[in-house]
Curated annotation (Swiss-Prot):
It holds the Pfam family Peptidase_M35. Binds 1 zinc ion per subunit. GO terms for biological process: proteolysis. Residues 1-18 form the signal peptide. This is Neutral protease 2 homolog SNOG_10522. Its cofactor is Zn(2+). PANTHER family: NEUTRAL PROTEASE 2-RELATED, PTHR37016. The active site is at 302. GO terms for molecular function: metal ion binding; metalloendopeptidase activity. It catalyses: Preferential cleavage of bonds with hydrophobic residues in P1'. Also 3-Asn-|-Gln-4 and 8-Gly-|-Ser-9 bonds in insulin B chain.
Length: 350
């Protein structure tokens, strides 16, 4: 655990991966369309093309209009360079969600949100960009707030030419901080140390299992990604087990991300991880049930987001077992919860 933050730039990612065709793609009632609006704004239009009302999780997803989470992915240089994301990635406590954490869409209904991409991405150099939205959106049945599954979504490719000077004038969703002292003291410090120790143990065990191909098809859809899965998990184990880590750990809320049901969040551009109050009050040190949430796998989840640990950092393509296992192989390989769920499964022999 490190006291001063380290700034890092998100590493290159493949445009081909973002735009690849998923041969296992499932039918979905969701239609997502992106359209340019002004210099750097993107209008996102979500339509329910199904025959029944949908109760979709908005908290922490691309539908979230409060938290500065990644709503679209942007690529430059003809699609070869992923644009650095400057917001936060969160892990939610998936039990005890509230009705206002969801968006209800009747059959045929449309919801529109506007995303100011310059507030969340590094666009000051300007140029040509390709924009996507793709993942699995968790839902609850009827008026329930208990997650029941996930629905795939994939937008069109939106090509934009952005004026860098104009984009640079847009206020950032998160203000940069040069140094933030750790507030993990007393019992919180003890809890975080235990979580990181367990994180290192679980990540090491999961890395060994991945090398052997154990359970990979369930959580990552293929065994061909074994070396990448294992390498990321080994990097996480190293960081969780180090006293001179590549991430900064904090127990207060300097970026105001600890809203209801947020267990922890990471600011990837700073390799900065914050553990929220419910991380300490609502989670066990280690889960005793398959796919259960705990402090160890929450730490592991957040560590995978940090590009300073393993580059590029992961996305939040799908929360929870249902959403994570609905992802394509490429999406799962870059999904934080897939690693957390996999580590849990190896630990408990699920």
């Amino acid at each position: 655990m490190k006291v001063s933050s380290q700034l890092a730039v998100a590493a290159l990612a493949s445009f081909a991966t973002a735009a690849s065709v998923d041969v296992h793609k499932r039918e979905t009632p969701l239609s997502v369309k992106l359209a340019a609006s002004g210099n750097s704004e993107v209008k996102v239009t979500l339509t329910n093309n199904g025959e029944k009302t949908l109760n979709l999780l908005s908290k922490g997803t691309f539908l979230d209009e409060q938290l500065p989470v990644e709503k679209v992915q942007m690529y430059a240089a003809g699609g070869s360079d992923k644009v650095a994301f400057e917001g936060m990635k969160v892990r939610l406590l998936t039990s005890g969600l509230k009705a206002d954490d969801f968006v209800t869409l009747a059959a045929g209904e449309t919801k529109e949100i506007t995303v100011e991409t310059a507030a969340l991405h590094s666009l000051h150099e300007g140029g040509d960009f390709d924009v996507f939205a793709k993942g699995a959106l968790p839902f609850a049945e009827g008026a329930s707030t208990e997650l029941a599954g996930a629905l795939d979504y994939e937008s069109n490719k939106l090509s934009m030419t952005i004026d860098g000077a104009q984009a640079a004038s847009v206020a950032k969703a998160l203000n940069k901080r040069t140094a933030i002292g750790s507030s993990c003291t007393g019992t919180k410090l003890s809890t975080v140390r235990t979580a990181l120790s367990n994180c290192a143990r679980l990540a090491n065990a999961a890395a060994s299992a991945a090398t052997s191909g154990t359970k990979l098809t369930t959580y990552f859809k293929t065994t061909s990604s074994a070396s990448t899965v294992a390498a990321r998990l080994r990097a996480v184990a190293s960081d969780c087990g180090s006293t001179s880590s590549r991430t900064t750990t904090n127990c207060n809320d300097p970026y105001s991300g600890c809203s209801s049901n947020v267990l922890a969040y990471t600011v990837p551009s700073a390799n900065f991880i914050t553990y929220c109050p419910i991380f300490f009050s609502a989670l066990p040190a280690l889960a005793s049930t398959c796919h259960g949430q705990d402090q160890a796998t929450t730490a592991l989840h957040e560590e995978t987001h940090a590009p300073g640990v393993y580059s590029p950092g992961t996305q939040d393509n799908g929360y929870g077992y249902a959403a994570a296992t609905a992802l394509s192989a490429n999406q799962a390989l870059n999904n934080a919860d897939s690693y957390a769920l996999y580590a849990n499964a190896i630990n408990l022999n699920c």
